[in-house]
C-alpha cells in the first residue's frame, strides 16, 4: 500500500510539475512577444494600405500640390478627369451586381434620350392668316365626324324572330 501511495504521490507531483512547466513556457513566450513589440515601434503605427503608401511616396498632384496621386480618393481636389478615366478602365475587372447593372442601364437610356432630343430639331411653323386657320380648323373638325349608318326598322308584331327563344 505504501508503494502505491508513493507512486500516486509521485505521479501527481510529476503532473503538477509538467503543468507548471507549460505555464512558465507560455509566460516566457508572451514576455518575449511583449519585448519584441517594445523593441519594434513600427508595429504601433497605424496600418496603411499599399495604395496610401504609394500615394505618400509619389510626387505631388498637378492642381493642388497635396502630395497624393491623381487616382487617390483621399483628396477631393485631385484631377477629376484622370480619376474618371481610371474608374472607367477599372470597371472591366470588377463583377457588376444586379443593382449596378440596373443603374448602368438607366444611365445609358438617359444618354440615348438626350442624344435623340439633340438630334430632333423642332419643325419651323409657318405663320397662317386667320382665314386659313379657321378653314383648317373646320376641315379637321369635319374629318372626324362620321355619318350615322342606317338602322333597319324593327317590327313590333314579332318580338322574337326565332321560335326557339320564344318557347323557352
UniProtKB/Swiss-Prot annotation:
Localization per record: Cytoplasm, Cytoskeleton, Perinuclear theca
Tissue: Specifically expressed in spermatozoa (at protein level). Detected from the elongated spermatid stage onwards; not found in immature germ cells or somatic cells (at protein level).
Keyword Manganese: no
Alphabetic keyword roster: Cytoplasm, Cytoskeleton
Region (Disordered): 144-168
Lineage top rank: taxon: Eukaryota
Cellular component GO terms, alphabetical: acrosomal vesicle; perinuclear theca
Presence of the UniProt keyword Acetylation in the record: no
Name assigned to this protein: Cysteine-rich perinuclear theca protein 1
Source species: Mus musculus
